[in-house]
Amino acid sequence: MEVLCQAPAGNSNFACNPKFTAIRTRAISSNDTFKVISSTGNNKKMKGAIRTSIPKPSALPLKVSQLSPSADSMPVPASLQDVEAGKLIENNPSGGDTEELFQYLVEILASRVYDVAIDSPLQNAAKLSKKLGVNFWIKREDMQSVFSFKLRGAYNMMTKLSKEQLERGVITASAGNHAQGVALGAQRLKCTATIVMPVTTPEIKIEAVKNLDGKVVLHGDTFDKAQEHALKLAEDEGLTFIPPFDHPDVIIGQGTIGTEINRQLKDIHAVFVPVGGGGLIAGVAAYFKRVAPHTKIIGVEPFGASSMTQSLYHGERVKLEQVDNFADGVAVALVGEETFRLCKDLIDGMVLVSNDAISAAVKDVYDEGRNILETSGALAIAGAEAYCKYYNIKGENVVAIASGANMDFSKLKLVVDLADIGGQREALLATFMPEEPGSFKKFCELVGPMNITEFKYRYNSGRKQALVLYSVGVNTKSDLESMLERMKSSQLNTVNLTNNNLVKEHLRHLMGGRSEPSNEIFCQFIFPEKPGALRKFLDAFSPRWNISLFHYREQGELDASVLVGFQVPKGEIEEFRVQANNLGYSYEIESLNEASQLIME
């Protein structure tokens, strides 16, 4: 709960916020142009030294601005919220340059990744296969020694360095799986590895790097500042910077996963790949489209972190102004230059999924073999499930890459809360019933055979009706529909809130007797997880606006969702908006949210 820690008094540092040899990619230079997608609709071309991905904390769905797509962009609605989960957003690839793909293939086959990586198993998921009616296969990259595929790309690039470069050492900036991959590679090659991490990095991840003999440098309270410092150290000390995805040698290392899948299974309908910066899918596609072009290569992203989908749609790299960090391993604001070029030429399309679906996929893998994936590690499985359901795929071989298992233990509770809803095994409902004797018994009789998994009620004096917030286990859709019909026939107004994120994240934890403060508005803010975040928030608003509610919910390692109630007179709403915008935290006014009106008013 770093977000609730106060900074020392007087601390004002609250900052938030085609020959093969010719395709070597560097950090983005001041001449690179890309598009910025802003939630405010202020979309613009940018030039600047932005290197890899620097997400702005947000747990809210991405709001996509209305931009005119290029002639060769994908036929997708301007708002990705209109795209159904599982629907393939087609890419119409050109196929790429044959000679270049051959050179990628040769390099992939010659890679030395097996000095550190295992040939990970491709396991049949019997329960998922039966449920979906397909042959569902999971590529178990979570079984690598560092519990992630990232060691492949990092090590492959490091094996290409000269003796002099290795003697000087390597450096990177990461608080995740890439850090361990670089540290392990350096240990194997007997060179020093410096890993720059934000000061807010959990101790368990710091120790994981130290256990691999990596030198940890803690700098800055954001990834942006950590990477800036790493690049400066690389220049000052002559170290080689190992990027997480945007380099051909990194892409080649990740591409070795493709060779293994193709050797382990034939006649594959589609391979589903989690997408962050694009290194993994670019490598897998570079291999498959040369040796088995009939196999579909489909990327999977969360709705709130759709940088590759947006980039393919607009025909150029797009930098997202807001990124949902729920699946923090793929929370990338700007995809790589080389990875985007390859994906544009090679992959068949993208699928988007919700955080609920990702959580359900974590549970599905646990049910299969008692293994727990991290959220980004289960992303491709969620996408493959959604795709098979949407298109009613039957009898085909479907492969999903389980990319990692470095789950932050504190995040498990949130995943558990969302898993049954995401798997359509639970429905979240609100029912109004008379505040009179016998109502509770009648309610239970109407629920009937449905299993109540959560129930919250509080007596409200002075009101004729009480609101009950509850969850029920769902075996079939018809069972739920029958129960809702029974409620309706008995004149008990019932609302299905299963898909309401505000309820799932906050309001289900806030049931109680109602109060009626005047001029109350509700806002959901995304706080960066760092000391001083709360103080900065409190300093941003006029003290004349009373805070009437405050509920904090951790979302991951980088940010937290906070629901706040303010008492703001109607004539001062515009002033409130100005101060909220100046704060620099992502936010949304939730007063018009259906659930907010039902539960809080």
From Swiss-Prot:
First and last residues of the transit peptide: 1-51
Pathway: Amino-acid biosynthesis; L-isoleucine biosynthesis; 2-oxobutanoate from L-threonine: step 1/1
Cofactors required: pyridoxal 5'-phosphate
Primary location class: plastid
GO cellular component: chloroplast
PROSITE patterns given in the database record: ACT_LIKE, DEHYDRATASE_SER_THR
EC identifiers of the protein: 4.3.1.19
Catalytic activity field: L-threonine = 2-oxobutanoate + NH4(+)
Induction remarks: Induced by methyl jasmonate and feeding with the herbivore Manduca sexta caterpillars.
MF (Gene Ontology): L-serine ammonia-lyase activity; pyridoxal phosphate binding; threonine deaminase activity
Localization (cell): Plastid, Chloroplast
Chain ranges of the ACT-like domain: 427-499, 521-592
Keyword Protein biosynthesis assigned: no
This protein's UniProt keywords: Amino-acid biosynthesis, Branched-chain amino acid biosynthesis, Chloroplast, Isoleucine biosynthesis, Lyase, Plant defense, Plastid, Pyridoxal phosphate, Repeat, Transit peptide
Superkingdom: Eukaryota
GO biological process per UniProt: defense response; isoleucine biosynthetic process; L-serine catabolic process; threonine catabolic process
Pfam family, one: Thr_dehydrat_C
InterPro entries reported for this sequence: ACT-like_dom_sf (IPR045865), Ser/Thr_Dehydratase (IPR050147), Ser/Thr_deHydtase_PyrdxlP-BS (IPR000634), TD_ACT-like (IPR001721), TD_ACT-like_sf (IPR038110), Thr_deHydtase_biosynth (IPR005787), TrpB-like_PALP (IPR001926), TrpB-like_PALP_sf (IPR036052)
Function statement: Catalyzes the conversion of threonine to alpha-keto butyrate in isoleucine (Ile) biosynthesis. Required for JA-Ile biosynthesis, a signaling molecule involved in defense and resistance to the herbivore Manduca sexta caterpillars.
Similarity field: Belongs to the serine/threonine dehydratase family.
Note: Plants silencing TD exhibit a stunt growth phenotype.
Protein name as catalogued: Threonine dehydratase
The species this protein was found in: Nicotiana attenuata (Coyote tobacco)
